[in-house]
Amino acid sequence: MTKQHAFTREDLLRCSRGELFGPGNAQLPAPNMLMVDRITHISDEGGKFGKGELVAELDINPDLWFFACHFEGDPVMPGCLGLDAMWQLVGFYLGWQGNPGRGRALGSGEVKFFGQVLPTAKKVTYNIHIKRVLKGKLNLAIADGSVSVDGREIYTAEGLRVGVFTSTENF
């Protein structure tokens, strides 16, 4: 079976309902926490480390929910949502590779914010570079990522860690 290398918004919504990788396996969050509109490229080769990469996008418009509350009179997308989007994509990668279980963000190394997403922006682009995938009792991916707005890099994160668990009872 050939792997799909791009995913539409509808595909991602299917993933949020648990329909893309099967019951009990990796899911994306549902809207409003789903911070990705499409994955334009996913591969288990390439990227900075030669172990895989993802490129995904989020369309920005002034009506997005977070602009109304963060901050009143000074709307900006919370940086933590961009960080969460990168974790979402690393978890998606594990599911796409066929690793069973539910995804959980496990941490990251250094995170830097040096720009912002305003309601006047058009598009956020996420770039994820897989560093390592560990398979065993716990299937874990480690990646570096960046967030760009309208072509300008504004956040970076090193050592993004996501695991998939067949049971989250004792997590």
Swiss-Prot record:
Keyword Nucleotide-binding: no
Tagged with keyword Manganese: no
Listed GO biological process terms: unsaturated fatty acid biosynthetic process
Signal peptide coordinates: none
Catalysis performed (reactions): a (3R)-hydroxyacyl-[ACP] = a (2E)-enoyl-[ACP] + H2O; (3R)-hydroxydecanoyl-[ACP] = (2E)-decenoyl-[ACP] + H2O; (2E)-decenoyl-[ACP] = (3Z)-decenoyl-[ACP]
Catalytic residues as annotated in Swiss-Prot or TrEMBL: 70
Location (main, coarse): cytoplasm
Protein name: 3-hydroxydecanoyl-[acyl-carrier-protein] dehydratase
Organism: Pseudomonas syringae pv. syringae (strain B728a)
Gene that produces this protein: fabA
